[in-house]
């Protein structure tokens, strides 16, 4: 019996694939558990339209991410932090601080998408990676300055 998988199963395949399984396995386990659907003409057409919609949605998200990446690339962000005379910060500049400074500039980025190799603990200029989508990333230039 041909079924369409709704979830990834290591022994059968990935979600959305059409696989051939034994009738008993499909009728007694996969279909009642909601893991698979019978592969009829209607479900195959529905699957195809769903894939097209998903592809369109992903492309729209990719375009939006590229626009944000262009904005991020052009920014030279200033982050103010309390620091001692030696240039060492009292505390650290984290991805949350950077996300907040970005939102003040009008660019909304989730703090989890900002990748710091380690928290910033001294004054100076830094480059930080921002992964906005699967294959869209940008480099943000940050200058950490002392609060006056």
From Swiss-Prot:
SUPFAM superfamilies: L9 N-domain-like, Ribosomal protein L9 C-domain. It comes from the Bacteria. Pfam families: Ribosomal_L9_C, Ribosomal_L9_N. Keywords: Ribonucleoprotein, Ribosomal protein, RNA-binding, rRNA-binding. Disulfide bonds: none annotated. One of its GO terms (molecular function) is rRNA binding. One of its GO terms (biological process) is translation. One of its GO terms (cellular component) is ribonucleoprotein complex. HAMAP family: Ribosomal_bL9. NCBIfam families: L9. Binds to the 23S rRNA. Belongs to the bacterial ribosomal protein bL9 family. This is Large ribosomal subunit protein bL9.
